[in-house]
Every structure is written in structure tokens, then in C-alpha cells.
Amino acid sequence: MKKFLLWTGGLVALLAVGYAVGPDVPDAELDPTLPTVTQNLTQLEAEINRSEAAIPDLKPDNEARIVWADTAKKQKTPYSIVYIHGFGASWAEGDPVHKNLAQRYGANLYLARMHDAGISDPDAFDDLTPENFVAGAKRALAIGKTLGDSVIVIGTSAGGLLTVYLATTHPEIKGIVLYSPCMAVYNSTLKLATKPWGRQILNRAVGEHRVSDYESERSNYWLKSYSTNGLMTLQQTMDAVSQPEIYKKIKMPVFLGYYYKNDNEQDKVVSVAAMKEMFPLLGTPDSLKVERAFPESGNHVIASHFTSQDWQGVQYATEQFFDKVLKMNPVATLQ
């Protein structure tokens, strides 16, 4: 028995060493520097349209775009709004809330498109990295700064994660709106993806592709299939951003909204607990941050007519944040 226990202990130790020295996943190396974009608004829109038209397999109506406050003048506005969608989604994930907010406050709106979003290629995300994932958000902010004197960034899900990163590195942002930000996924086992043997574990558990079962209309605006390399990248980015020392760097006004009714009826895509842990750690003064649960939204995606049963409530609460915290004056009354 003693020899057996010694043998068993040795085997466990050997397996532990083998796990620890297994293939590793590199840490994200994120650079906060924004890219340079033209300040000529006519040229800027043309460049966006041209680059989007060149994307192979981009599905109709998924392209990034500028929504002008005044289509006749197409000029810089006092405020601009940048919308950053979530993992594998599109601008439709925040529609119509982002458009209604932009109209109400007379703001130019930039609807960004992240790397590989909106394409029909089933291998989408096969080359996604934390660096090119974040690059899309940085370009969106650079465009937003060109479109408005002050920028408000709205992010949903993984777009909220990217928005948090932008807020820590660009304090000039006027305010951020986080709809169901993906600070951690609901199923915490994804954290294994960035541990030794993580890629192998992920491929064995999930397969090389994730395939969605969205209904036909929604599937036009969300990826139907993507490489699970994207999940690896998502976890790498969360590892880099979802940290207390990151949260305390955020000083500007923050609106946090999510779906939560009770322990059973809540967001089961991303972790509400992780959002609630983040909120008190933000460096933003208490008077400048708002946390709201939307129990009737019924879905992780709370600001889209495709998914949310209470996008109107989400919009109203965000308007109150704009009015009372950001001190923005409406220029239009929506019917």
C-alpha cells in the first residue's frame, strides 16, 4: 500500500508538472494609442464606406457607418456617440436606442464594426487576437473624436468590455454607457481557455466552431458560425481588462445596465455578479455613476428591438443619465 501511495503521488505530481509546462496562451499586449484618421469629414465617410465595401463576405446592412445629426450639412457636432457592439454582433444590437439617443441630443453617431463581425464566412474570428479586437474599438473612438467635440461611448456585452478599456486609457471621454458588459462570462469555465493547454481544452469541449441558432431576421445581424479561437481571444481580453486596478482608473461618468430579475431569471450569457463587483471599484465619484437592473428586458441584449422586451425602459434610463449626469440638453423630442 505504501508503495502504491508513493507511486500514485508521483503520478499526480508528474501530471501536475505536465499541465503546468503545457502549451501556454500569451497575455494580451494592448496599446492605447489611437490611430490617425482624417479630420475632413467628407473624406472620412468616404474612407469608411470604401474600406467596408472591400470586406469579403460582409452581409448586407452590417457595415460600419456614420449616422449624421444633419445629413444636409454633415458637420462636427458638440457631442458624438460611438456604439461598439458585442462579440459576433453588429450595430443592430443597440438599435434603436443608439439612434434615438443621437437624434435626441443632436449628436453624430458612429456605428462601429469590429474585426470579422457581420461576415458570412464560417471561419470568422480564426485570426482574431486581443490586439486586433481592441484595434477596432480604438479606431471607433478616433472617428468619434473627429465627429464630435465631446464623445460618449456606448458598448454592449464584449463591446462594453472594450469600452471599459477605452475609458481607462482615454480620460477625455465624456461618459460611457455599459449595456450588459462582458467583464466575465456566465459560465466561468471559459477561464480555463487561457490556462496551460487552454486551446486544446477549448477545442475538445466546444469544437473548432460555434454555430448559432438565431432566428432568420436576427441571424442577418449576428454571426451564424465562428471559430472558437474567438472565445480564446475574448478570455484573453477579459484577463487583461477585468481587473480592480483597471477599474479604479475610470473617472468619467458611467451608466451600467443589465438584465436581472432574480437568481433564475437573469443574464446567463455574461456574469451580472462580475458587473456588480466592478461597479463600486470604479474611480468615478458615486454622484456620477448609475447602476440599473432591467428585470423585464428578458435577454442579455437589453437595448435592441430584436431581443429586449424593455428597450424603451433602457432608453429612458439612459436619457435620464444623459440629462442629469452628463448635463446634456435634448435638441429633439421623439414621438
Locate predicted features:
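Gly/Ala-rich beta-loop-alpha elbow adjacent to hydrolase catalytic centers
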Residues: 154-163
